Amino acid sequence: CSESEKFAHITFFLNGGTNESFPCESHVRIPSPKGVPFDQVPELSLPAVADEVIKGLETGYDCIITNFANGDVIGHTASAEAKIRCAEVVDYHLGRVIEAAKEQGYVVLITADHGNLEEMLTPDGKPNVAHTTNLVPFLFIDPLTSQTIQPADGSLQDIAPTLLNILGV
C-alpha cells in the first residue's frame, strides 16, 4: 500500500522491474493530492494509507509492505514548516500502524533508503531539498517480546533476507 507519488517503490522496484502483481499479492494505490503544492499538504494521503494498512492487518495478510512517502516528498520542498508538520504526521500515523500491528501479532520492520527531511539547511544556510547520505535507522519490532531492536550495522541488501527469514521462506 502506498500513495501514487511513490507507488513504484513498493511495486515495480520490489517486484524486479515489473508492474504485474504476483499470485497472492495485491497492490493498493491511494491517490496523492493533485493540483496543490506538496508543501501545502504535508500529510499528503498518509491518513488514508495508514487506514488501508490497518485494514490489511486486521484482514490477516502474511506480509504488508507500505511506503510512507511524506518524508521524501516533503523533504524536497524548501518549507521548514511543512517538514516539521510532515514529521508530526508521520509520527502519528506510524504509531497507529505499529499499535495495530502489535495487536494483530505482526513483526514490524521500519527503515528508509536515504535521509532527506532531517537536514533543514545546507552548509551555506539555504533550504536543503536533496537526499542526504546520513545513516537511516532500521527498527525491528517484535510483538511477542515487546522489544524494539535497532541493529548497529546493516544495509538495504539485508532487508529482503530478513523479511524472508521472518516469513519462513
Regions found by a protein language model. Give the residues of each.
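Feature captures the catalytic ectodomains and active-site-proximal regions of enzymes
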Residues: 1-169
